[in-house]
C-alpha cells in the first residue's frame, strides 16, 4: 500500500550506512545479514564467516561459498533439505546460531526448476544457451551504452556456473557435506543481450524415459515445493507457468510473473536431435538474486534454523 511504502521510505531514511568491515558493530544492530558485496572471493569468504561467527546468520548472493562443502546452496523449492548441512557447518565455525547459506547463480533459474520438475523422466543430457540481461552485470543502459543494439557472446565465469551449479542443487548430503549429482551432463553458452531485466534460456533435453509433451507440461504447472506448502510471503503461488503461444515467454510480457519470483516456460516441442526443447524465462534480480535470497531466509525461519522474526 501507499502508506506502507511511505513508512518503508521513512525507516530507510533514518538508517546509518556502516562499513561492512565493522563486523562486531554491524552484527550488534542486526539479527540477519544479506550479503551481496563487491570484493575478492577470498575477502567475501572471510567476511561472511566473520559475520557467522558473531552468531549472525548470513544468506549470500555471492558465489564465494557456493562450493564450500558444508555451506548449503539452495533454491527452496528444489533442495531445502540441504539446509540440514548447516549443523556440521556450525561445528566447523564454532557457532550455535551463526551460519552461511547461499543461493545459486541467476543464469540457472530459467531451467534448473524445469529440469527438477521433470526428474522422474531422468534427463541425462542438456544443452542450454542463456540470453542474459545487463542488470546481471549491475548495469543499466545509461552506464553501459555500448550494449544498446549489441550482443556480447561471453560472460566471465558464467558458463561453468551454469553447467555445474544445478548438479550441486541435485546433490545429497554425505558425512556432513554436500556431494554433487553426476547427471545430467549440462553444456551451456551464456550471452549478454540488450535487455534490462530477465534471463532467457533456450534448452534442449534428452531423457532416459521419454515422456509425452502433455506429461511434461503437467509436471511444470503442478510443480511446487516447501515454500508453497508453507505459504511463505515471497513464494510464488505457482512457480512455473506454461505459455501455449508460439511467441512467449517474452521479457516484456512475462518477466514479472508472480512478482518476478516465478518461471515462465514456452515453445516446448519435440526435437530432431534431442528429445525435447523449450524456452525458459526468469527475473534475474528477483528470483535470481534478491528475491531468491529473501525466500531462502523465509524458509530458514520457517524450518527453525534461525532465531529471526521475519515480517
What label would you give each PLM region?
Residues 31, 56, 98:
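Conserved acidic residues
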Amino acid at each position: 500500500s501507499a502508506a506502507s511504502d511511505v513508512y518503508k521510505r521513512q525507516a530507510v531514511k533514518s538508517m546509518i550506512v556502516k562499513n561492512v568491515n565493522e563486523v562486531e558493530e554491524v552484527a550488534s544492530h542486526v539479527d540477519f545479514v544479506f550479503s551481496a558485496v563487491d570484493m575478492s572471493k577470498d575477502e567475501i569468504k572471510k567476511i561472511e564467516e566473520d559475520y557467522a561467527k558473531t552468531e549472525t546468520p548470513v544468506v549470500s548472493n555471492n558465489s564465494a561459498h557456493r562450493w564450500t562443502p558444508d555451506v548449503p546452496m539452495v533454491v527452496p523449492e528444489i533442495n531445502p533439505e540441504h539446509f540440514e548441512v548447516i549443523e556440521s557447518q556450525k561445528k566447523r565455525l564454532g557457532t550455535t546460531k551463526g551460519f552461511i547459506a547461499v543461493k545459486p547463480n541467476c543464469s540457472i533459474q530459467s531451467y534448473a526448476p524445469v529440469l527438477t520438475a521433470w526428474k522422474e523422466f531422468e534427463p541425462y543430457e542438456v544443452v542450454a544457451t542463456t540470453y542474459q540481461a545487463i542488470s546481471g552485470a549491475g548495469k543499466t543502459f545509461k552506464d553501459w551504452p555500448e550494449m544498446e543494439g549489441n550482443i556480447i557472446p561471453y560472460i566471465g565465469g558464467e558458463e561453468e556456473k551454469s553447467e555445474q551449479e544445478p548438479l550441486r542443487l541435485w546433490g545429497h548430503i554425505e558425512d556432513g557435506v554436500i556431494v554433487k549429482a553426476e547427471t545430467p551432463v549440462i553444456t551451456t553458452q551464456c550471452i549478454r543481450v540488450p535487455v534490462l531485466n530477465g534471463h532467457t534460456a533456450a534448452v534442449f533435453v534428452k531423457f532416459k524415459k521419454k515422456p509425452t509433451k502433455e506429461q511434461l507440461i503437467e509436471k511444470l504447472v503442478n510443480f511446487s515445493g516447501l515454500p508453497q506448502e508453507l505459504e511463505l510471503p515471497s513464494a510464488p503461488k505457482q512457480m512455473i507457468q506454461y505459455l501455449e503461444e508460439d511467441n512467449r515467454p517474452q521479457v516484456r510480457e512475462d518477466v514479472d510473473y508472480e512478482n518476478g519470483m516465478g518461471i515462465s516456460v514456452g515453445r516446448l516441442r519435440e526435437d530432431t536431435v534431442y528429445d525435447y526443447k523449450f524456452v525458459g524465462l526468469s527475473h534475474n534480480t528477483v528470483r535470481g538474486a534478491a528475491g531468491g535470497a529473501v525466500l531462502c531466509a523465509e524458509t530458514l525461519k520457517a524450518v527453525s534454523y534461525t532465531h529471526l522474526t521475519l515480517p
